[in-house]
Amino acid sequence: GNVTPNLARSWETPDKGKTWIFNLGQDIFWQDGEKLTSDSINYQFSDVEVDKPDEHTIVFKLQEQFSVFPSIVSRPTFKKGLLGTGEWKVTNISLGQAEFVQKLILVNTKKDKQIYKFYPTEEQAKLAFKLGEVDEIQGIYNIKPFDIWSTVTITEEVNKNRVVVIFLNTQDKLLSDKSFRQALTYAIDKNSGGQRAISPISPNSWAYNPTVKTYDQDLERAREFIDELPNELKENLSINLVTTPVLLSLAEKISKEWESAGIETHVQVSSSIPYEFQTFLAIFDIPTDPDQYAIWHSTQTSTNISKYQNPRIDKLLEDGRVELDLEERRKIYLDFQRFLIEDSPAIFLYHPVTYTVIRN
């Protein structure tokens, strides 16, 4: 999606994306009654110079051109005490171990109260609902056992801002071979989850490319790619698939499909991104802006999950984050998706369905 005005009514860049000037609204107040001014907004950027020439203007001076910057500063803004500018005010916050937020209490101007509780896993949230600790749970992926309860109302939504994806370790001896990566991709039935995904960019985005290669399931094609592998790779063809607990059943299904193509598969469960892996099945949060430099650029060693290195992709990502013209940016990201999908450093499966369960 596009960045839209909120606290800032308008913004501009006089030098092609190196300096960004934001003009704040003049009729906005914090929840304590204080007027919102440039001095009451603080961003902690280590490599950005911030000037506030008057109470309605903030100027950010970057070290390099960066067309994505408006989306970076579009996150929710609070002042000290978790005070915002909206209808609902945080009146209490409870923290657990490692500063994990356990509970928020919010009150609006009519004195209505909402209590939000947070759980580290989906299973713990579902248990809390069963025990009557909460009356509504949001954003769960596995609706069981509530689908057979008569005392609840269930709604579902396809979350197009997330994608279920298998990251392939392109530095692995076996997975460095493009033909093998494509064999894995062709072997999977990708229509058994939510809405079919073909790209790391959301279909809601202005940069989405609907014409990329789709890799519909084709076991015969997968076996052909495997037959073409060098003999030393075909010997004892075996692979590990790591996944998170919520996707375990999907991982087991994929394991059977890979084995049908002649690839012995071992499934492991991990609660975090493993440092060493061959294939990793996870749910990926798609950034609002199509810039995915952190995920696919070869220099991003801590966030490039597939350990992917491709000079053409690097150049497209570099160009996309400095280009200001929207149509030119769109062309760049259309090419980015086309070449990335062709090279198969990851397998995009579907946009997941999430459920909300409300006690009647």
Could you say what each language-model-derived stretch is?
Residues 1-15:
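N-terminal lobe/hinge region of extracytoplasmic solute-binding protein
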Residues 2, 55, 61-116, 122-124:
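Gly/Pro-rich hinge or "lid" segments in bacterial periplasmic/extracellular proteins
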Residues 93-105, 115-171, 279, 283-284:
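Extracellular/periplasmic solute-recognition and catalytic clefts
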Residues 105-108, 152-183, 187, 207-212, ...:
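A bilobed periplasmic-binding-protein/Venus flytrap-type ligand-binding module shared by bacterial periplasmic
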Residues 116-127, 245-246, 267-275:
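Short helix-initiation/N-cap motifs at beta->coil->alpha
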Residues 146-157, 279, 290-304, 360:
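Ligand-binding "clamshell"
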Residues 176-256, 260, 268, 335:
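Append "and occasionally in soluble cytosolic enzymes with long acidic Gly/Pro-rich linkers
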Residues 266-271, 294-359:
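Extracytoplasmic/peripheral linker and loop segments enriched in polar/acidic and small residues
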